[in-house]
Regions:
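Short acidic/polar capping segments at secondary-structure boundaries
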Residues: 9-12, 27-31, 53-56, 77-78
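Active-site regions of enzymes building and remodeling cell-envelope glycoconjugates
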Residues: 19-23, 68-69, 165-172
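Acidic, metal-coordinating catalytic segment for phosphate/diphosphate chemistry
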Residues: 140-195
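Glycine-rich phosphate-binding "P-loop"
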Residues: 11-30, 99, 104-105
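Short, small-residue-biased leader/transition segments that mark boundaries at the very start
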Residues: 2-7
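Hydrophobic alpha-helical segments within soluble ligand-binding/sensing domains
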Residues: 25-43, 174-186
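PRPP/pyrophosphate-binding module of the type I phosphoribosyltransferase fold
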Residues: 37-51, 58-164
Length: 195
């Protein structure tokens, strides 16, 4: 049984530093059913997009569960805190795109990816989702002025009133924690929540 729970640690190896059992609550267990309900499963007109090479494994999990194609944004950093989209790997032309990330801080990577999908890739609509919405600095202004139709985040970080936009959708993680705690109490598998 687990003694601690966490939502979407950025590096799975962190679990090795705890002296007690830890369950990593994956944000995908909330986000994937939401996407399936909104866009369907196995649709050819919707593409899951990794906003950078570091998010490919996460995006691939979404494509497998949702039976949707994958596209990848290949970006470069010519200098610190500056990213530039070099290529879009995969077909997004005429498609709805869903950018999948773990954390959105200043939203620079996310918005550059959304711009590239529309302007260079020919995507018809862009959506985005992430487990954690830090939304610091220029994030809100960037998101508001971007082609992103809807950003869905989890309530792992409280969204203050000055950060609330009509295009930001917040999903609760409490049901996942509730189910995990019940399974820990009943001494049944927690990991099957995230398969």
């Amino acid at each position: 049984s687990s003694a601690a729970s966490d939502v979407y640690k950025r590096q799975a190896q962190i679990q090795g530093f705890f002296d007690i059992p830890v369950d990593n609550m994956l944000g995908s267990s909330v986000l994937i059913p939401y996407i399936a309900g909104k866009f369907g499963v196995g649709t050819d007109d919707t593409v899951i997009v990794s906003p950078d090479l570091g998010s490919v494994t996460r995006a691939r999990k979404f494509t497998q569960k949702l039976d949707m194609p994958l596209a990848i944004i290949d970006k470069r950093r010519p200098k610190a805190n500056v990213s530039e989209v070099m290529n879009i790997i995969g077909n997004v032309e005429g498609k709805k795109c869903i950018l999948v990330d773990d954390l959105i801080d200043t939203a620079g990577t996310l918005v550059h990816a959304a711009d590239a999908l529309v302007e260079r890739g020919g995507a018809t609509e862009v959506y985005a989702c992430a487990s954690h919405g830090v939304l610091s600095g220029p994030a809100i202004e960037r998101i508001q002025n971007s082609p992103i139709k809807e950003l869905t985040i989890l309530d792992t970080i409280p969204l203050t009133n000055d950060k609330k936009l009509d295009k930001i959708n917040v999903l609760p993680v409490a049901p996942v924690f509730t189910e995990a705690i019940a399974r820990i109490y009943e001494e049944t598998s927690v990991s099957t929540l995230f398969d």
